[in-house]
Structure formats: C-alpha cells, structure tokens
C-alpha cells in the first residue's frame, strides 16, 4: 500500500508573512479534495495533518516527518505534495514509477516556465553544501549547474525513509547556520530560502548518496506561461496560489 501525505501549519511568526495566509484555507481544502480523489483512484491511503510533530523553528521542516515518523513505515511509497499542487491528470499513476530512493523534479529554466529558475549554484549555496559535507551534483536530465530537487512533489520509498531517519543531519543545525531570517545583521549569506527544507533535503541526498530519480516537468509543472501546457501535477508556487481558487474552487 502507498500513501499520499500533505500538511499545512498556521504561521508561527518565523519567516515572511505572505498575503496568501488570507485565503490559504480554501487552497488547502481544494488541494486536499483533489488528492483524496487521486488516492482513491490509485488505491493509496491519504494522510493530511495540521499538527506540529517535528521540533523545529520553521514550519517548512515539518516535511521531515516524511522520514522521522515511523507511522509511515507500513507504506511502500510515500508521495509528498505541497498544498499548492493539483493533480490535473487523475489517470496517470505516479506510484507506477520505478524509484529506488527518492524522485522529484530538478529545478531548471524550462522554456514553458513563467518565472526564471532561482536555484543556481552561488557562493552562499555552495558554502552550505560544503559546510554540511555534501558534494555539488549536476542534474543528468536537464541543464543547471547544481541539482536541486523541488521538494513540493516527491516520491520516497520505504527504504529511503528508514535510511534517512538513521543518517540525516539535524535539520535545526542546518536552519541555524548563517540564517538571515534569525539574524538580520548577517550579510552576503545568500537568500533566506537557502536555509529551509528544499536545500536541506538536497544537501542530505548528496551527502548520503541517495539514488535520485529526476522527474519530468509533467509531474511538477511550476507556473507556466500557458495554463494549458500539458502536465499531470500543476504546482502553483509563490504568488500563484490564487489561481487554484480561480481554476478549481
């Protein structure tokens, strides 16, 4: 049996106060309902949480529940999806993909993207990888000078989750390192997003030599110039979340 996991936590005062907090509950409900249906179609369990289970300053690191919580050990594959993701194509079964450890979409400048890729190798980002003992790895299927898997859509196998629980570094050590969210006086340490879940997990994947399957944009279509650009999962990142209410509400 496989499982789909989503979560949403109310803001806790750490990080930016985005305007989407004003309407996010509707977005959450829409995404939940779509993925409940997707789970039912593909014979998977659906699990949603709004409880804090991971000891962390930042809500982003609740995603680490994927591997920290032994509750999920009874499931084969775990699909994690952010609450701003919609399965536009219900027929395609992501659980049929052959995954050894984890699978996700590598950030890059896909020609269909609405916004440019913000995840490129920079000195501050390279410093973080080096600080935590991780090599810089380039993607195999797309062009970019660093492989950064977008953590908004991920498949994790049971073996990968158990392995991560045993091996991965403490996420708070990563979050506390040169973090401009926590220390406003820090200069030239990179963007605040360098301190949160996406780079942390990618550092861990590289450090502990996880087998990373690179998915095509059809499984994590971040905002595109053309809403009709074909995909299985659409990911309405950043300030595009209202689109979920407009299109699916």
Language-model-derived ranges and their functions:
Residues 32-36, 67-69, 91-95, 198-202:
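Short amphipathic alpha-helical segments and helix-helix/interface helices
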Residues 4, 46-49, 79-82, 103-105, ...:
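A structural signal for short, well-ordered beta-strand segments and their strand-loop junctions
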Residues 31-33, 87-91, 218-221, 238-240:
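Short, polar loop motifs at secondary-structure junctions
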Residues 141-248:
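Catalytic core and acceptor-binding pocket of nucleotide-sugar-dependent glycosyltransferases
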Residues 1-75, 237-244:
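N-terminal anchoring/stem segment of glycosyltransferases
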Residues 56-126, 154-161:
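GT-A fold catalytic core of metal-dependent nucleotide-sugar glycosyltransferases
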Residues 1, 74-76, 100, 212, ...:
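A general structural motif
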Residues 126-144:
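Short, flexible, basic/aromatic active-site loop/helix in glycosyltransferases
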């Amino acid at each position: 049996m496989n499982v789909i996991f989503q979560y949403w936590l109310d803001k806790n005062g750490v990080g930016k106060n985005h305007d989407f907090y004003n309407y996010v509950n509707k977005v959450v409900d829409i995404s939940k309902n779509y993925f409940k249906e997707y789970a039912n179609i593909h014979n998977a369990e659906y699990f949603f949480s709004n409880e804090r289970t991971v000891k962390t300053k930042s809500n982003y690191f609740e995603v680490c529940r994927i591997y920290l919580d032994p509750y999920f050990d009874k499931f084969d594959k775990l699909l994690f999806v952010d609450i701003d993701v919609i399965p536009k194509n219900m027929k395609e079964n992501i659980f049929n993909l052959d995954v050894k450890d984890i699978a996700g979409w590598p950030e890059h400048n896909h020609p269909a993207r609405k916004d440019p890729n913000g995840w490129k190798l920079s000195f501050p980002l390279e410093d973080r990888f080096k600080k935590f003992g991780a090599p810089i790895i380039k993607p195999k299927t797309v062009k970019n000078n660093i492989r950064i898997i977008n953590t908004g859509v991920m498949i994790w196998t049971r073996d990968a989750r158990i392995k991560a629980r045993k091996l991965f570094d403490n996420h708070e050590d990563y979050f506390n390192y040169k973090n401009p969210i926590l220390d406003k006086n820090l200069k030239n340490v990179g963007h605040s997003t360098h301190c949160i879940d996406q780079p942390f997990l990618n550092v861990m994947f590289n450090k502990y030599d996880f087998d990373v399957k690179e998915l095509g944009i059809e499984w994590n279509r971040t905002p595109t110039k053309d809403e009709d650009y074909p995909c299985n999962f659409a990911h309405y990142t950043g300030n595009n979340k209202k689109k979920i209410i407009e299109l699916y509400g």
